Amino acid sequence: NIQAFWIYRNYFMNEFDAKLGEIVLVASEDTHYSIPKGANLLQIDRISVPVDFETRAINEEQLEELLLIAKANGKKYFIIVSNMGTTMFGSVDNPETYTSLLERHQLIYKLHIDGAYGGFVYPFNNEKSVINFSNPKISSITIDAHKMLQAPYGTGIFICRKGLIENVL
């Protein structure tokens, strides 16, 4: 996951001359603990989006409010982390919840899918899912063979769209 944040932070700086304080990472309150750690390591501000207690779905109204507050506070570039199976609940975020609001308010973003937990299961059990690279709004995906396939540590996989990795080379 941190690779995505590193790439997108640098992408915004390289392509838009963004300042660090103009970049923010947005993820649900159920996201993996590596997400806030990665934001901290890269000195990226972070917004934690509340979820519904029963369904664990992103609270759209609060997300919109948080995005508008961030914009009013000078945030211009948004790194979005959408979960494909959280470790605590197995919940899957709908990336469209994020992208529809970001686009409605004309906010610049990159969308990362954290599929470390569910990436080896969810796509195969949900044939109609658009949480894959057929969705042009998705910039990167993380999957981890350690979590579901019982492979050794260090078998995490990060995949991003062509041209993005150059921002960290």
Where are these regions (language model features)?
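Conserved PLP-enzyme active-site core in the AAT-like
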Residues: 3-168
